[in-house]
Amino acid sequence: MLKLLLLTLPLLSSLVHAAPSLAMPREGIVGGQEASGNKWPWQVSLRVNDTYWMHFCGGSLIHPQWVLTAAHCVGPNKADPNKLRVQLRKQYLYYHDHLLTVSQIISHPDFYIAQDGADIALLKLTNPVNITSNVHTVSLPPASETFPSGTLCWVTGWGNINNDVSLPPPFPLEEVQVPIVENRLCDLKYHKGLNTGDNVHIVRDDMLCAGNEGHDSCQGDSGGPLVCKVEDTWLQAGVVSWGEGCAQPNRPGIYTRVTYYLDWIYRYVPKYF
């Protein structure tokens, strides 16, 4: 996974010197454990062909024919749907793959880099998938859902298990429970150790923070889902986007806030199916 090369211009000078890893997309799970085989049936693996169909990002099945992911996963170098494949929920990467083709990639038009927000994209599968007990969609939240600070949610993926420590074979799906961190508090945390003025918002309104020291997403599953259980229903609160390091003090993981983009999502994805 490539590093994001640019930072938001007002933050550039302070962040490059104080936190050189801030531009890393989020790609895996730290402080978690292997997920049991019947959990997270909406989790998908995005693949790109590099001598083999290699996992590079995560995503979530939100409709039998649509996958939600991060825009930075499908930037200009991966914009051709013919060069992508989707693997539905499986316990171990690369074991008996059944890869699905993609007919359309739709990145949010406001996306430039993850730190500027709008880090969200949709993939339309060539054919709808069969919904089963092992593979089914995750519900999107109502626009009124705020996911208050302290709410315990889960993030899943196949990425690194610590800074620069890859997930070892057989590459099981990992999960970790993370608390929601209120945006203003998260923004204050990200200002610690930086010379950036308090009037410069690092954490934008379209973002959501979750995680604490030792429990976080990391560097293989950007685009994956952050889900929270609300009244016995799993709702996708966020899309794994970016952060500084993995599970570092005062640096929660930053996610795209799904409720902020519901109107945009439903412009393409049928709400009822």
Curated annotation (Swiss-Prot):
Q: Which Gene3D superfamilies match?
A: Trypsin-like serine proteases (2.40.10.10)
Kindly list the GO molecular function terms attached to this UniProt entry: identical protein binding; peptidase activity; serine-type endopeptidase activity
Which cysteines are disulphide-bonded? Answer: 57-73, 153-228, 186-209, 218-246
Catalytic site positions:
72 (charge relay system), 119 (charge relay system), 222 (charge relay system)
EC numbers, comma separated:
3.4.21.59
- Describe how it is modified after translation: Glycosylated.
* Pfam family, any one: Trypsin
Purpose: Tryptase is the major neutral protease present in mast cells and is secreted upon the coupled activation-degranulation response of this cell type. May play a role in innate immunity.
Give the quaternary structure.
Answer: Homotetramer.
This chain belongs to the protein called Tryptase
Name its species: Rattus norvegicus
